[in-house]
Amino acid sequence: MEVSKENGLCLQGRDPLNWGAAAAELQGSHLDEVKKMVEEFRRPVVKLEGVKLKISQVAAVAFGGGASAVELAESARAGVKASSDWVLESVDKGTDSYGVTTGFGATSHRRTKQGGALQKELIKFLNAGIFGSGNSNTLPSAATRAAMLVRINTLLQGYSGIRFEILKAIATLLNKNITPCLPLRGTITASGDLVPLSYLAGILTGRPNSKARTPNGSTVDATTAFRLAGISSGFFDLQPKEGLALVNGTAVGSGVASIVLFETNILAVMAELLSALFCEVMQGKPEFTDHLTHKLKHHPGQIEAAAVMEHILEGSSYMKMAKKLHEMDPLQKPKQDRYALRTSPQWLGPQIEVIRAATKSIEREINSVNDNPLIDVSRNKALHGGNFQGTPIGVSMDNTRLAIAAIGKLMFAQFSELVNDFYNNGLPSNLSSGRNPSLDYGFKGAEIAMASYCSELQALANPVTNHVQSAEQHNQDVNSLGLISSRKTAEAVDILKLMSTTFLVGLCQAVDLRHLEENLKNAVKNTVSQVAKRVLTMGVNGELHPSRFCEKDLIKVIDREYVFAYADDPCSSTYPLMQKLRAVIVEHALNNGVKEKDSNTSIFQKISSFENELKAALPKEVEAARAEFENGSPAIENRIKDCRSYPLYKFVKEVGSGFLTGEKVVSPGEEFDKVFNAICEGKAIDPMLDCLKEWNGAPLPIC
């Protein structure tokens, strides 16, 4: 809040309630925000000042394992020292202060003059977590590192009564990748994350039960942790208020939330791109992205999602081909696509708005002072309040998890259409691409897995914050459950990655199938045309035959017929191709009139020789076209290379995921693993942004 002084009075600025600042944070596009996050994530140094920390920086330190160096702004030292000195001076004066001379929480009526001993007892009784054997009950190192960074940042603002040297020690642990072991469970994030943060304090004070992880993953005690980190000053004897300053904050919940939201923002952009690629391989109608439709709805998330998809689809080679296909027999085809495609901007837009709002809420939280009491040196007083209540975390994470579940539901709906040959405009059932469909079930198992992922994701979407229990002798009778909600949202992010991986690999399989489809169709058309010219053009005496007019209509049959409906046995009489080719010749024969009675001009009599020659030639040509495709030398190039979605396809291929066929030993899951690991390592980020590098941030003009 801006404050100016005039005539000795403190006057509030123009935005005393901070609504204006909150609204200003949402200026600009979501994509630009994500680009900025990525840029911040990749910076080598995170400098903490107390007020400018970003979720991307938290993620960088959390995931970096010391690669992103943490520096503390020297400008913060004086303020931190002033509050620390104030506490000591108040103790010397005999001032009665909560957590300094009093007990804690519901037992704050107790009094003591042993301030240092009180802080030791605080850390000891809060060491109530359970680790068990193994690591399943230990907070992941990335989450702990995030919490450490956030706690330093909030304490740097100088309202907490803690020494600057303690904050430097935490930063050193981060930079040396020495990570205290914190319990996974046991906090209600009000009063802050007391139990887990007490284990950070335990390392700093050298408690014998404290453990830490080293860079190689081994577990060591506090003494070894300090030695490996190069902290030669020894363990800290906590001064009055310092233990409370360390544990009474929301850093664990907000730290995990920061990691979660960094990944969620990226996955939201991926969902937009996958929807556009889905439109391409499904031969959809891009009209659903027209700006006027979305302008009339007014919601910015929807407008941007549509504009992103519109940009990908503009000039797409697939969309040009789809337009020609839709122009054939338009009255026999659906006028519009199903909801999973047609309303994808309307579906994704609100989720992106929720994710953006949650991101800004958490960024406010990680830059807040959130312990109690707060030391106001300027007014010479300690303020007793409740900034440790992590409600912004619990609410933001519940909302984010709902948004993630909605994105996952859309992906599942789109994937279900993609693998279903009743809906996918000619792609084979299960996206199977082998020569024998009876021995190739492609993505059938993947669809079952997607149903499982989606179900679990929807179960996780249930809110955490409506399960509050009164705690600590009814002193903490309402509490945020912030870390619990953050942890559940982290689980949801992991599942959405599984779904995004499966869907992306499926879409790339569909891209390859469209490529194969074009080459097979080209081979069929050429073969039918050649056979028609040889058999149907001339009569027995060298004269032009009435059947020569069949060729054009025979080619139309091939254009209209789905290739994969007959590709495994193109001349089978039970498949539609041969049936419809014969029907063309029969129709011409019926229209041949009296000429049909003359054996020299009869079209009926050409059917047998036409079919026999076709049966001799077509299977060989189809197999040759398939072999050329598999050898990387197809007659027709893959049109994905002319599309803005190409970088995503290229990414999948470059990580080693290939074209799945029934003849290969490799399973779908093996291909998914390659892409999943790459996504988890952040390798999909640049290809995603490359898809949108030409976008100017605005929809196409309405004209």
Swiss-Prot record:
Example of a GO biological process term: cinnamic acid biosynthetic process
Compartments (UniProt record): Cytoplasm
Amino-acid positions noted as binding (E)-cinnamate in the UniProt annotation, renumbered to this chain: N248, Q336, R342, N372, K444, E472, N475
Biological or metabolic pathway of the protein: Phenylpropanoid metabolism; trans-cinnamate biosynthesis; trans-cinnamate from L-phenylalanine: step 1/1
Active site: Y98
Annotated Gene Ontology cellular component terms: cytoplasm
Modified residues annotated as 2,3-didehydroalanine (Ser) in this record: S191
Residue location of crosslink 5-imidazolinone (Ala-Gly): A190-G192
E.C. no: 4.3.1.24
Catalytic EC class: lyase
Pfam families named in the record: Lyase_aromatic
Catalytic activity: L-phenylalanine = (E)-cinnamate + NH4(+)
Location (main, coarse): cytoplasm
Keywords: Cytoplasm, Lyase, Phenylalanine catabolism, Phenylpropanoid metabolism
CDD domains the UniProt entry points to: PAL-HAL (cd00332)
Origin: domain of life: Eukaryota
A Gene Ontology molecular function term of the record: phenylalanine ammonia-lyase activity
Post-translational modification: Contains an active site 4-methylidene-imidazol-5-one (MIO), which is formed autocatalytically by cyclization and dehydration of residues Ala-Ser-Gly.
Family in the record: Belongs to the PAL/histidase family.
Family annotation (NCBIfam families): phe_am_lyase (TIGR01226)
Quaternary structure (record): Homotetramer.
Function in brief: This is a key enzyme of plant metabolism catalyzing the first reaction in the biosynthesis from L-phenylalanine of a wide variety of natural products based on the phenylpropane skeleton.
Protein name: Phenylalanine ammonia-lyase
Species of provenance: Bromheadia finlaysoniana
